[in-house]
């Protein structure tokens, strides 16, 4: 799993939006300590969380499973553009047969779990899918055979308010292990000067 922060909004934009309400622009210190404290006080402590929506982050997420993608898609206040399996299954079609000991080669396509039985089942499903592709069945139809562990990637854009909600819920120990890992990796990818606005679930 790899997460790359592609773009983010400056804290000065959020501070400016908050100061618009009181027309207190002269008190700004250009995104310094005063503005940082203002954002935290108004957006977090005073619960005017809509002001945090002016902060927007775009991430490029690679190497998560389709199972994790389904969990991610439940967070609807975000925009996601996902790698199309319909157009990329030709990569798999060109592979040699996957046998039981071929996990290292299969990891290009599959997310590895802690369960050997699950990994073996995923490997068999991957080979079954490859065989279906070799029959000349269209990618549009063959993708119905994709295992949930099949890797994908996406560009994901989310505002700070929605990201706070995501990180709190998905860093919990009750969340899927893979999305817990994603939550932690997203938090680490945030700009250092923004991280004070976000907390991971301590139970995670």
Curated annotation (Swiss-Prot):
<keyword id="KW-0489">Methyltransferase</keyword>
<protein>
    <recommendedName>
        <fullName>Flavin-dependent thymidylate synthase</fullName>
        <ecNumber>2.1.1.148</ecNumber>
    </recommendedName>
</protein>
<comment type="similarity">
    <text>Belongs to the thymidylate synthase ThyX family.</text>
</comment>
<feature type="active site" description="Involved in ionization of N3 of dUMP, leading to its activation">
    <location>
        <position position="170"/>
    </location>
</feature>
<dbReference type="GO" id="GO:0050660">
    <property type="term" value="F:flavin adenine dinucleotide binding"/>
</dbReference>
<dbReference type="GO" id="GO:0006231">
    <property type="term" value="P:dTMP biosynthetic process"/>
</dbReference>
<dbReference type="GO" id="GO:0006235">
    <property type="term" value="P:dTTP biosynthetic process"/>
</dbReference>
<feature type="domain" description="ThyX">
    <location>
        <begin position="1"/>
        <end position="204"/>
    </location>
</feature>
<feature type="binding site">
    <location>
        <position position="170"/>
    </location>
    <ligand>
        <name>dUMP</name>
    </ligand>
</feature>
<feature type="binding site" description="in other chain">
    <location>
        <position position="143"/>
    </location>
    <ligand>
        <name>dUMP</name>
    </ligand>
</feature>
<dbReference type="InterPro" id="IPR003669">
    <property type="entry name" value="Thymidylate_synthase_ThyX"/>
</dbReference>
<comment type="function">
    <text>Catalyzes the reductive methylation of 2'-deoxyuridine-5'-monophosphate (dUMP) to 2'-deoxythymidine-5'-monophosphate (dTMP) while utilizing 5,10-methylenetetrahydrofolate (mTHF) as the methyl donor, and NADPH and FADH(2) as the reductant.</text>
</comment>
<feature type="binding site">
    <location>
        <begin position="159"/>
        <end position="161"/>
    </location>
    <ligand>
        <name>FAD</name>
    </ligand>
</feature>
<dbReference type="GO" id="GO:0004799">
    <property type="term" value="F:thymidylate synthase activity"/>
</dbReference>
<feature type="short sequence motif" description="ThyX motif">
    <location>
        <begin position="74"/>
        <end position="84"/>
    </location>
</feature>
<dbReference type="Pfam" id="PF02511">
    <property type="entry name" value="Thy1"/>
</dbReference>
<feature type="binding site">
    <location>
        <begin position="74"/>
        <end position="76"/>
    </location>
    <ligand>
        <name>FAD</name>
    </ligand>
</feature>
<feature type="binding site">
    <location>
        <position position="50"/>
    </location>
    <ligand>
        <name>FAD</name>
    </ligand>
</feature>
<dbReference type="InterPro" id="IPR036098">
    <property type="entry name" value="Thymidylate_synthase_ThyX_sf"/>
</dbReference>
<comment type="pathway">
    <text>Pyrimidine metabolism; dTTP biosynthesis.</text>
</comment>
<comment type="subunit">
    <text>Homotetramer.</text>
</comment>
<keyword id="KW-0285">Flavoprotein</keyword>
<dbReference type="GO" id="GO:0050797">
    <property type="term" value="F:thymidylate synthase (FAD) activity"/>
</dbReference>
<feature type="binding site">
    <location>
        <position position="165"/>
    </location>
    <ligand>
        <name>FAD</name>
    </ligand>
</feature>
<keyword id="KW-0545">Nucleotide biosynthesis</keyword>
<dbReference type="GO" id="GO:0032259">
    <property type="term" value="P:methylation"/>
</dbReference>
<keyword id="KW-0808">Transferase</keyword>
<dbReference type="GO" id="GO:0070402">
    <property type="term" value="F:NADPH binding"/>
</dbReference>
<feature type="binding site">
    <location>
        <begin position="71"/>
        <end position="74"/>
    </location>
    <ligand>
        <name>dUMP</name>
    </ligand>
</feature>
<feature type="binding site" description="in other chain">
    <location>
        <begin position="84"/>
        <end position="86"/>
    </location>
    <ligand>
        <name>dUMP</name>
    </ligand>
</feature>
<keyword id="KW-0521">NADP</keyword>
<keyword id="KW-0274">FAD</keyword>
